[in-house]
Amino acid sequence: MADPWQECMDYAVTLARQAGEVVCEAIKNEMNVMLKSSPVDLVTATDQKVEKMLISSIKEKYPSHSFIGEESVAAGEKSILTDNPTWIIDPIDGTTNFVHRFPFVAVSIGFAVNKKIEFGVVYSCVEGKMYTARKGKGAFCNGQKLQVSQQEDITKSLLVTELGSSRTPETVRMVLSNMEKLFCIPVHGIRSVGTAAVNMCLVATGGADAYYEMGIHCWDVAGAGIIVTEAGGVLMDVTGGPFDLMSRRVIAANNRILAERIAKEIQVIPLQRDDED
């Protein structure tokens, strides 16, 4: 039986590459930077241009499909995940990196049916790395199969996380406290690349052993989550329970041993869900 969603995935790869070309051209030029929820929550005309390009192209080919896009939500649309085939799009994951020309910027596309992710595409466009995964068929970077690391000892692990966009003193204290707890276990190190999607792809490659973050959105992780699991890794809620795409929090690790240890150490930061008003 033919894969009903393979054509959609092939189209997503084509669109991600086209979007990446737009991003890589724009990063060379002066930018009009705007603010969203705070002085550090940035958006550019390129974010909006790329999302509009992606959604309009997909709508033309698949008019019955649904969409959740970062900039559409910022403009007032709802993040509602239904059973309908849904494209979950982050046109530029790592906008702050993009603004500063820090070279980790990704176009991220996740595709869900019946609320389950069927495939993910993450194009780290400055690096020229195309990460892809189809449910049940493995994860790849530029055609090379990915495999998570085999590390089970957290004291020998390399973690990735982000400080996030909140500058509320209480939240910042909790973020730094969580990092301190993990750092002092001790772990080999903690890194921050500046994009959730690339952080998760680094776990999929085996370059990092685990990633955790609270404050992300569904479009940050929809594409990369399946890349982690298809590379042999796990997704988990920061409480140690099942991962929930709309919860705004995730642990992505090479195995349950590291994921559960991270969940045990960190304090949960209260957040409004993506699907709540």
Swiss-Prot record:
Impact when changing D93N: Loss of activity
Superkingdom of source: Eukaryota
Entries under SUPFAM superfamilies matching the protein: Carbohydrate phosphatase (SSF56655)
Effect of K36Q: 50-fold reduction in activity
E.C. number: 3.1.3.25, 3.1.3.94
GO cellular component, one term: cytosol
Transmembrane portions of the chain: none
CDD domains: IMPase
Name of this protein: Inositol monophosphatase 1
